[in-house]
Every structure is written in C-alpha cells, then in structure tokens.
Amino acid sequence: MRFVIVGGGPAGNTAATYAARLGARVTIVERDVIGGAAHLWDCIPSKTMIATGGAMSFARRIHGMGLEQANPEVDVEGLISRIEGIKSHLQKSTTTLLESQGVQLIRGVARFTGPNALTVETAEGTEELGFDCALVSTGSKPRVPDWCFPDGDRILTTRDCYPPKTFPESVTVVGSGVTGVEFVHMFSSFGAAVTLVVSRQQVLPGKDPEVAAVLEEDFLARGVRLLKGARATSIERTVDDEHGDHVVISCDDGRTVRSSHAVLAIGSVPNTESLGLEAAGVEVDAGGYVPINQHCVTNQPHIYAAGDVSGKLPLSSVAAMQGRKVAEHVMGLHTREHRHLDYDKAASAIFTEPEIADVGLAEAEAFAVGRKIRVTKVPFSATPKALINNDSRGFVKIISDPATGVVLGGSIVGRHAAELISVIALAVTANLKVSDIVESLLVHPALAEALVDAAE
C-alpha cells in the first residue's frame, strides 16, 4: 500500500505513524515544517507566551498568599529563546518518531497531477510520486480581509505575534473569538494596554453567556477596553508628532482606536488553493474546504482529508484523531468493530485567565431543540483548593439527562479548566452517569472536587 500524505501536521503525522506500523509504505510531503505550521508556528508559540504571561499575572497576585508583592518584567530575548527551544524540541521529536517508523519525509510543494499521482517541487528539482491512497492535511493560515494589509511589524496576523518585532505598548485585537481573547489575555498579562473590537454584544459569541461574563469581568478588571457592537473596516499605519509610529483602527459605527499595534484574529482559511485537487477529481466547497464523510474520505474513495482543511473542528486533538481514523480506514481496519469520530464530543479549551473549557452538549443547544436537561453548577469559591490557590474565580457546570443521569456535556471556567475538562469528556464519551462521578474517590484538597459537587 503506497500512502502519500500532503502536510505534516498533527493529522498527517498521526496518520503516517499508524499506517506505517500497520505495514503501509508512507511518504509525507511537507512544505514548511515537520510538525505543522499551524501547530508549531501558531499553537505552541502562543501557548508558550500565554504560560509566561500567566506566570507574570500570578506573580502580581502573590501578595494574597502571604508573600511580598512582585512586579516581573518581560525578558523578550529570553522569551524568544524559550519559544524556539520548545518548537525545536517538538519538531525534532516528531521527525525522529516518523523516521523510526520508516516514513519517508520530503520537503517541498506538492501538487496533484491525476487521481493517483502528484509532483513535488523540492530544492533539488521536481519529483513524481504515485500512490494508492492519499491524505490531504495541509492545514490553514490566518484569514486576512481585503481591507487590511498586514506588514508583520505593526499590523499583525496571529502568526506574526510570537513575539512581534517590537513589543507592544498598546494593542488592538480585532476578533473576539477563541484566538482573539487569548491574545487579549496574553498581551494584557505582559502589561500592554489592550482594546478588543467585539462585533457582537459579548466576547466568545458562540459560548455560554455565563462563561463569557466571567471572562469579560476579568478583562475589565485588567483595564481592557471592550468595543462592543463594532466591526473593524480598516487598519492603517501612520506616523505623527503626538503618537509617533502607530496604527488606527476604524469601525463601522464611526469609532476609531489608536494603538502601537493591531492584531487580526478573525479566523483562518484552508491551504487548498494550489494543490491541484481538481486534477485528482477532489471536490472543494466554496470556502476552500474539502468535504469528507465519517471516515474522512473525500468524494474520491482513495483520497482523504483531515485537519483544518476538512472544515471540522480546528483543533490539533481532532486532527490527530482524524489521522488515526484515516490510517485505520486505509489499512482496512474499519471493517472490524470501529468507533466513528464524534465531533460533538470533542473537548476544547481557551487558554485565558481564567481558563475556559467545554465538551459535549451546551445548555443553549439543548434549549434550541427543546431537549430536557439537568444543569448543575458549583462555583470554585466553594472548593478549598481554589481558596488555597488564591484563585476562586469560575465554576463547574455539568449537563445531564434528567431521566437517565447520563452526562451529556459540561463547562468549566477557572484555573486548570483545560485539564479538569478531561473528566467530563471521558464521561461524555463513555456514556457515564453523574453517579459514576459522584462515586469516584478523588484527591482532597483538589480542584477536581468541584466536579463531584457539580455532579451531585
């Protein structure tokens, strides 16, 4: 079985290692970086900076723990070194794993030339590859509207921010979704004056209003300015005697914002425009995404798509799971007992302060379809470990079926929410009941005790 994978991110890498272990002859073609550009150039650097910013934020609160007040400052060179060190370690470990499985790695730009062939433009020339099955997992890139022209210096896409060439004294973030609020948290933690342009009446418009309210409260406490009900229509760089080199963001309601930097965080677009998918007969939708079925198969039965290009949840965890499912399908394991990937049960997290995480059925979704649910909510202020940590913000909310007690979903806002949500995610995936959580003997004192309290 000749299996060619275009794109070496989480989906491609996972598909490659699983398929190679099952006996396939696997080749990965990667244009940018083994490990994935969105993963190693976006996700990992942003979370590294958020962790550093979180450490600074925590240091400012230690006076509440019987310690002297601390006021740490950013060591930009040290931060850059830390980011590059983590990226290098992850890239090397991924490359080593793939090579140990016998996966062939080709650095170059792939383009399909037919239903079973593609060419790769490398530094040495053009190489032709034939395949029995192929996976398109080329990821995505930041979306840039036609009214904005990022320069990588003052007007930034998310990929320009790790860290920016000049550290911002003030920054305006355009976009109040997951990525946007993470940048607000990150730059405000570093001491920048932050403005967030919010097109709706709450941040995180797709999330539970109670969740958004906790985050907004934290933003306002940090001095973040929220421009609600405004859509940015232009971002221009200018220089004057009063403000020096800065940017001006204009909104559709006439409001303007001046800041040293602006960050576009308005989503991403798939990397499919130059792959030659039409030559392979692969259909692409109006947004550039590749439609797939439950096995990640495109309209061509031997060509798969996974990760951001598939138009499903843009999460590394989802991409990696898709990659494993693709490998199993390529090698025929789907004919055995097989669990399809259920995107509705994927856990997700937002690395703000406090952290936000959710999984499964949301309260608003249940109400929209008239489904009866049981909602229980416990604040972390009732949990001893939260008080010990000097951080009692947030809550745990569990949604269950009132008739059966089966856990349907949940939300957590608070410290380590991204870790704690795994308990609810496991319950949702395994169809456990709230009584299963209640009967679990957990550690005391621990934040996880709030899960038991909420389940009761």
Model-derived features with residue positions:
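A Rossmann-like FAD-binding core segment of flavoenzymes
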Residues: A70, Q104-R107, R111-T122, L129, ...
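Glycine-rich dinucleotide-binding loop and its adjacent helix/turn
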Residues: C43, T138-V197, E278-A280, V284-H295, ...
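Flexible, glycine-rich terminal cap/loop adjacent to redox cofactors
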Residues: V6-D32, A37, I44, T48-A55, ...
